[in-house]
Amino acid sequence: MGIFERYLSVWVGFSILLGVALGLWQPAAFQAIAALEVAHVNVVVAVFIWVMIYPMMVQIDFSAIKDVGKNPKGLLLTIVINWLIKPFTMASLGWLFFTVFFADFVDPASAQEYIAGMILLGVAPCTAMVFVWSQLTKGDPNYTLVQVSVNDIIMIFAFAPITALLLGVTDIVVPWQTLLTSVGLYVLFPLVAGVVTRKYLNKNSGANSDANSHTSSDQSSDQSSHASSNENSHASNAEASLTNFLATLKPWSVIGLLATVVLLFGFQAQTIISEPETIVLIAIPLMVQTYGIFIIAYLAAKWLKLPHNIAGPASLIGTSNFFELAVAVAISLFGLHSGAALATVVGVLVEVPVMLSLVAIINRTQHWFK
């Protein structure tokens, strides 16, 4: 484990401080970067997230995806958490905190907008960053891909009606461009790149294996034994080639995460300084929701006797959010400077530190699933 992985929480904390400092020092530069958007998806952030996702996509073996159906409980858990529990607990917590606990600190109109923003986060399960969290918990990359894909399909049909139900708004317009752009950037493109890379590594390792086999075939008369040896050699070379390639990528994956944190906090530096009390008030129920959903999902995974490499990602998909979609809908419904938009932004700021703490919990409780 390298210095970045060993002290990841420290590096993230430093990146948060650096992002805020740079955002205050060079606000124009961050505004220019923030303006580089396609369908409310920031291109620069997308590149860094792509750098984080790509290593896991290289690990995906399509020949093994068919085996995912042998353990459907992980998929079922993810679906139940994301669509039957999470949106409604988020709405309940938003109402409880902002109409009861924080009623003396927030005016009713602002409270309703904050609740709306929290609901939008609750109805949008993660598409991109879950690949990063899965990789950090040594999750099954094939299973994670299927989990994310199934949730993306459900989201297309369920996001608008659940959002309308909880917000009490009937004319919810799903920003299809944002949704499809995000799925393309964070799932399809890196997946294709990963598949092409894996095939290239296998082809090269196969060529090396064939070269070695021709050298030894002149000295061997047992053809069947030679064929078996050649197969094993090819598999061994392919695995070694993949392992070496992933080891080369690993530092870049962590650097991508830290760069993303710097950008996200740099974008919101002015808001963090100008409205710290509001941000704290919004962050509290969001953190309660995140840890609460994780506890429910993780304990359910243990009860279902899921293997650790499925239980971890299954518990993290629901706790992480599709913030691009939530921000886009908040802006379209309530406006750029609304309380709802602010709440979705706070969700972005809270997510990385909280999710890293959950990653640490999953890694330290691996023995629960043995």
Which residues fall in each region the model found?
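Alpha-helical transmembrane segments of multi-pass small-molecule/ion transporters
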Residues: 1-58, 63-319, 323-370
